[in-house]
């Protein structure tokens, strides 16, 4: 665990942006794996692998007020692969999200305290193995059955589109929030997700973004055992804007992807494919493939080069944009919500963190 902790914690100088990002991400990771270890049950792989992605979404992209988690125009975050719930509990704790009861009354206490995380997956805990709606503030929907979360996110996007059409006026937008859903291989295998994706493409829901963690690992082994279809081609057929982001650990690359497929400018639902390098390393270790089998897999891959390395976007049609945002992309970032934003809160809740250097 000590290898995951940034050496900048004990440094006398102010932390740089990159160091603070790394410390925040590693804090999410270590909090998640400690909770799983304490419970002797759970799924640590996805929280470790997707911590950079979720940190980037919550810290740089989403509009969300931790002091008012029921703000009607907040961006929605759906963790469709709900077995990775420690990823969500860690973020809700570190952002300081406040609790709201069933009557939507603000209680003034943390939605997820450190003590709740200590009792992860225990009877009566506010940090169960799968997110449950109305039990914890910040949970937008119950996710357990794979595919259910992404399907529900389509309904959320439809609801926002209806509200915007009904209540918005020129130069006075009341509803313009977006819906972000994180999903995995299991969600892509489920029929309910395919049906919902088809509907979203038909309706051209430009306020919806699915982020697919393409880590090639299941509880039974590599996904090649039962799942070899071309996901990108499927979603292009649905009419989505498809983008291969690449390494889920590259937060700058993830943020750049926002400005190519950011909702309302892409005019289509967006589907990102990210690769959890950490999870894929675990997969290769568990499967222990021989050199000949690895070579055969690389040669059979439609996106493999002669040296066996994948070329980003090489198996996608030209409509999929590369990751090279225009210079004006950052200036086009949507405004922060009314009230305090969650941007600095993850770092603020990490012990011994120091202000960013200017």
Q: Where are these predicted regions, by residue range?
A:
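Basic/polar N-terminal segments that are highly enriched at the extreme N-terminus
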Residues: 1-21
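Cofactor-binding active-site loop characterized by glycine-rich and histidine/acidic residues
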Residues: 50-203
